[in-house]
Amino acid sequence: MTSFLKVIILIFMLNCAFTQESNQKIKAAIFDLDGTLLDTQRLYDEANQIVINQYGNGKKYDADLQVKIHGAPPSFGNKYLIDYFEIKLTMDEFMGKKDEYLKEKIPQCKPMEGVKELTHLLKHKYGLKLAIATSAFKNSTDIKLTNHKDWIKEDFDVMITGEDKRIMKGKPSPDIFLVAANDLGVKPEECIIFEDAVNGVQAALNTGATIVVGLPDNYVKNIMKDLPHDEIRTTLCILDSFKDFDYSLLK
C-alpha cells in the first residue's frame, strides 16, 4: 500500500469519526448533587428530624413533606420547616443545630451506587461535557466533595452552586440547569439531566432537555412519572439505579 493511499484512508477514517461524534444528539450531562451524585439526602433528613423532635410542635416529618423541600433551595426548605413545625429558632440557629449533626457526617458521604462508572463513561467514552448543578452553596458543596476531588476534577467541566447570581429562581424553576448548559456551551435540548427529587426533575423538564433521568425512592416514583412535560420533546426515564442507564439514549 502506497503512502498516498494510507493518507487517504486515514483522512476517511477521521472524517467518519468526526461525523459520528457531531451527529450524537446529546452533547452534555448535568447532575444534581445531593441524592444524585452523593448519598447525602438521607443525612439532611436525619438532621431535620433531630431538630424537629427537639423544637417542633409534634407534627410528623413525613414523606409528603420531604417531597416539598427536596431539591429546593436550602433557604426555602429551612424556612418551610421552621414555619410548619412552629420552631422558635432563627434561621441561623436552626441551621446551626442541623450542622452540629452534619459536620461529621457530610465529609464522609459516599457516591451513589454506580454513578462514578456512569460519569466516567459519559465523559471519556461518549465525549460528553459534564456539569454539577446544586442548590447548595459552594462552602457546603466543597465540604461534601472533600474526599471526591479527584473524581470531580477528572470527570466534570463545570459546577454551579446555589448562590450564583444568574439563578433568579430555585428548583422547580429551570434556571440552574439553564446556567449550567450555558457554561458548558450547549443548548438545553443537547443535554441529559440527572435528578433524584421531584422539584429537581420538574426543573429539568422545564428546560426542554431531550432526556431527563429521575432516580426517585419508591414513595415518589409515581409522582415523578406524572410530572407535566412535553412528551414529544423530552424523554423522561425513571430508573431504580444508575446501573440501569441505557447508553443508546445518547445517540
PLM features: what roles do these ranges have?
Residues 11-18:
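Hydrophobic h-region of N-terminal signal peptides that target proteins for export
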Residues 43, 72-73, 110-114, 136, ...:
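Short beta->alpha linker loops
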Residues 23-120, 124:
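N-terminal helical cap/lid subdomain that shapes the substrate entry/recognition surface
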Residues 36, 134-136:
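Conserved phosphate-coupling serine/threonine residues in phosphotransfer and NTP-handling enzymes
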Residues 2-10:
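Sec-dependent signal peptide recognition
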Residues 123, 128-130, 177:
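Short, conserved structural micro-motifs that define repeat-unit consensus positions
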Residues 18, 22-26, 120, 137-251:
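Asp-based, Mg2+/Mn2+-dependent phosphohydrolase catalytic module
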Residues 37, 111, 130, 193-194:
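Conserved SAM-binding loop
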